[in-house]
Design a protein with these regions (language model features):
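Amide-donor transfer/coupling interface in amidating biosynthetic enzymes
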Residues: 1-130
């Protein structure tokens, strides 16, 4: 990340910018996420509220939210308390989903996270079409 860029689309959260302790800026833990109705992700999870585990330092800068949505990227998962973007998708693409959390943290061999299951299914279908 270039700290001198004039367009900080991805950046540290404002309250984290003055923290200098190594690891002190990491967003850790399980957080609620409200999913947009009828989004691909809400259909994958089968609900409009999820809770997922995080471990990251940087966030999407909401100052760019409108501009991104006007150009096809939809922010379909938002933390209800902080209003941070948790999930994006591009509906016109076959399977284009980005998340701030780690779906692998809530996965086991016998019970994988729904996003992982859906991604693998989409990859199989794509491979069969090639």
């Amino acid at each position: 990340i270039d700290p001198t860029t004039s367009h900080k689309v991805i950046d540290l959260m404002d309250e984290q910018k003055s923290v200098s302790t190594l690891g002190g800026t990491t967003r850790l833990g399980s957080f609620d996420c409200t999913l947009r109705a009828n989004s691909k992700v809400s259909k994958i999870y089968g609900t409009q509220t999820i809770k997922e585990r995080h471990r990251h330092r940087f966030e999407f800068n909401n100052e760019y939210l409108e501009q991104f949505e006007q150009n096809g990227m939809q922010c379909v998962g938002i933390n209800p308390d902080s209003k941070l973007v948790e999930i994006i998708e591009m509906p016109e693409k076959r399977w284009y989903i980005g998340v701030q959390f780690h779906p692998e943290y809530s996965s086991t061999v016998l019970s994988p996270n729904p996003l992982i299951v859906d991604f693998v299914k989409a990859a199989i279908v794509y491979g069969e079409e090639k």
